[in-house]
């Protein structure tokens, strides 16, 4: 298994992580949740670089375009409450993915 540290290079991800860690910003729950969602979007984008793709032909108004699309179905699963904002960030990119949730009773 390969581990990728996406926060090692300076990017907007580091800005959002810094805001999550800031005790003053943590008091703003809406901003906190939005930053978690943004981090989910960044993670989804980075993850998309490692997925398998297949070649397809798409009919456009101007003709046929040969391009690629994700080869396999995606299933997103998160732990209820703690992972909901992060899950939403992934759903913003993988909007046709199946969803699963884990909870404890």
Walk through the language-model features, giving the residues of each.
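PRPP-associated nucleotide enzymes
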Residues: 1-105
